[in-house]
Amino acid sequence: MTNNSGNNSGNSNNPRTENHFDYVRITLASPERIMEWGQRTLPNGQIVGEVTKPETINYRTLKPEMDGLFCEKIFGPSKDWECHCGKYKRVRHRGIVCERCGVEVTESRVRRHRMGFIKLAAPVSHVWYLKGIPSYVAILLDMPLRDVEQIVYFNCYTVLSPGDNSNLFYQQLLTEDEWLEIEDETYAEDSKIISEPIVGIGAEALKYLLKELDLPFIGDGLRQEITGSKGQRRAKLIKRLRVIDNFIATGAKPEWMVLDVVPVIPPDLRPMVQLDGGRFATSDLNDLYRRVINRNNRLGRLKEILAPEIIIRNEKRMLQEAVDALIDNGRRGRTVVGANNRPLKSLSDIIEGKQGRFRQNLLGKRVDYSGRSVIVVGPRLKIHQCGLPKEMAIELFQPFVIHRLIRQNIVNNIKAAKKLIQRADDEVMQVLQEVIEGHPILLNRAPTLHRLGIQAFEPKLVDGRAIQLHPLVCPAFNADFDGDQMAVHVPLSIEAQTEARILMLASANILSPATGEPVITPSQDMVLGIYYLTSSKPAQTQPAFGERGLTFANTYDVISAYDNDRIGLHTWIWVRFSGEVEDDDESEMPIKIETAEDGSYTELWRYRRERFDKDKALVSRYLLTTVGRVIMNTSIMNSINAN
């Protein structure tokens, strides 16, 4: 099993003081450490902790059975400040151990962290280290996994000491028949064997083999062997050396991979609750623990009455399978199922996966001042803005709104403010608008694979229930608008708001931190829209210069005519333009030059017409272009001038 430890720097005198840890260490736990977790000495000197009975609760009194899986003596009282028999009630009896039932009078929440243990009648192998990938037991013993399994599950004997028998060697596998033959030879009348061979079977034999390993000596030998080997053999040696070095570095012993003691997790983490109809719903772990205790107790009784070896061996195998199912149901052998043929959830199932303890409860905690909604495109937003639904904003910023309502003397207390907020008056919306002004929010899209997966935006109140997102920031989030959801978080402190505004604002994250390439690049319908806006219809006839309705004095007249539906998006027009022009005209000379009597002249190009005075100073320039290109150019120029 694993052992979590750290340096506690908290004040241990006060039971309510939180424990502060410098680090968490996860290593193999020794049998003594597992017993330490569960064993406690009560104030009266009595030692408790071992769970010896498979019972959970008494179905008449509905109270936990003593020495069972929910025992109050081991795990603490079910009700605050009340012992099992009811002799002591109330907080004034804190710390007293009842003389009748032996339960310490304390808070019931201790049942969330007090552990117990089951002392096994025979050692069992830990299924993670036996059947895991890679199998650490097989690597350490330098044996095939199949052979190790044959030993653990009582299919084959292994030679622990060959004795004087020259036909045997250390760790050799023997079937039942082969061992019987060797026994007959060893104990025959004419036998010359003085030192008898010793064989073992089951987890006991495995524990012996692991205990005999001299890790530093084996490590030195492997290092020498690695220098002279290559290919697959070298890779195998390195893998074994790495495991050995880890054991040496952590101070763990290989035999700890075989369990003599099984920890029992606190009862409130595997609860049993009564349903409406009087029936009980219980955690699957209780069934798995019950199987282990039943088989363990049965094995203990069989050993006491000196039952035949074959029966004891079968019971040991069943105990091994029960512990396997408890630790990792389905890893080996037949999966243990409950009602409706549903596989029971083991300790591993509770820890691993998306719904496991780490990802669900420790890494992915629910936080206050956060929300979640579907995202839709907000093309009218600025790049540093996002559309926040009013319904969501009023909930997220409620404390700020209440504070401002009271400060502005609109209401007198929090209760009145909440009533006003529920009605969603215009007054409230006005205050909300003031609150969110300049208060950035964080948007996050899972999975957050790089730092641009969470960015800050200025919220803009919008109707509806969807968050509006600027289309250009989608590549950074790897988001699209086919039903993606995003989470909203509100930075509360001034420091957090400042950090969000300076470091995390979307307009400050234009380049990818990984490659230095721009991460804000238009794509899909943005590119298509720009293409459609600036494309032309070659077949359309181009107007003559000065043609009525198609020659304009400036770009604003063009946009005004388009807005009034007098011209289309792809209509060819002449427009006067005073800015710089970069022409991609292939010919370097104008098509035609018209000279006037006063010495002024006009150059005619394919897409432009320029008039100069006699001193060659530009008088006017008209461009032949489309309405869409004028709109595009004006938008870009306005953005540049605004900045």
From Swiss-Prot:
Which Pfam families does UniProt cross-reference here?
Answer: RNA_pol_Rpb1_1, RNA_pol_Rpb1_2, RNA_pol_Rpb1_3
What the entry lists under InterPro entries is as follows: DNA-dir_RpoC1_gamma, DNA-dir_RpoC_beta_prime, RNA_pol_asu, RNA_pol_N, RNA_pol_Rpb1_1, RNA_pol_Rpb1_3, RNA_pol_Rpb1_3_sf, RNA_pol_Rpb1_clamp_domain
UniProt entry keywords in alphabetical sequence? DNA-directed RNA polymerase, Magnesium, Metal-binding, Nucleotidyltransferase, Organellar chromatophore, Plastid, Transcription, Transferase, Zinc
Could you tell me where this protein is found in the cell? Plastid, Organellar chromatophore
- Cofactor: binding details: Binds 1 Mg(2+) ion per subunit. Binds 1 Zn(2+) ion per subunit.
Give the record's family classification.
Answer: Belongs to the RNA polymerase beta' chain family. RpoC1 subfamily.
Q: What does this protein do?
A: DNA-dependent RNA polymerase catalyzes the transcription of DNA into RNA using the four ribonucleoside triphosphates as substrates.
UniProt name for this protein: DNA-directed RNA polymerase subunit beta'
Q: Which organism is it from?
A: Paulinella chromatophora
